[in-house]
């Protein structure tokens, strides 16, 4: 699918507790959010994406754990039907979660027709070191 000239809105970054306060999220639209609340110091970046069918996908480079699902359910509107990735793609000692988010958005933009898990299989490896190299290479190329 060619999306070179397609506009997909992306809102400002928000904290997890501000997601529910967002006005209507368009189809498609990206929201980068931090898993900390607005008065916290910030903890980890993730992406909320509303796909063309209106379903929501959450990409988290460290994987959505049961603890994170509980946190997200607390802050996401009850009407959201959400698909999460539970697979970890980023090393635990890495601080590049924001870079992973932007890399995911870039890849998703050119593959809007792919479901979350399909896309993740094509862009990431089970080898976390290779994923780190891929994300860093993406930035070194000037994206």
Residue ranges of each PLM-predicted region?
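Conserved active-site-adjacent core of cysteine acyl-enzyme catalytic domains
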Residues: 1-36
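Histidine (H) residue identity feature
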Residues: 4-5, 44, 106, 117, ...
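Alpha-helix initiation/capping motif
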Residues: 9-18, 34, 66-73, 124-125, ...
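Polar/charged alpha-helical tracts
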Residues: 17-24, 70, 74, 107, ...
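Cysteine protease-like catalytic core of ubiquitin/ubiquitin-like
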Residues: 27-110
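Contiguous terminal or domain-adjacent regions
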Residues: 109-143
């Amino acid at each position: 699918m060619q999306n070179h000239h397609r506009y997909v809105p992306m809102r400002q970054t928000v904290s997890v507790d501000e997601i529910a306060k967002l006005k209507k999220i368009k189809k498609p639209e990206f929201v980068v959010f931090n898993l900390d609340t607005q008065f916290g110091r910030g903890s980890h970046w993730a992406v909320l994406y509303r796909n063309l069918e209106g379903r929501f996908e959450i990409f988290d480079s460290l994987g959505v754990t049961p603890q994170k699902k509980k946190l997200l359910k607390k802050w996401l509107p009850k009407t959201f039907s959400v698909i999460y990735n539970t697979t970890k793609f980023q090393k635990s000692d890495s601080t590049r979660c924001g870079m992973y988010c932007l890399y995911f958005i870039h890849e998703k933009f050119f593959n809007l027709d792919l479901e979350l898990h399909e896309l993740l299989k094509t862009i990431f490896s089970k080898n976390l070191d290779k994923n780190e190299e891929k994300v860093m290479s993406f930035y070194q190329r000037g994206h």
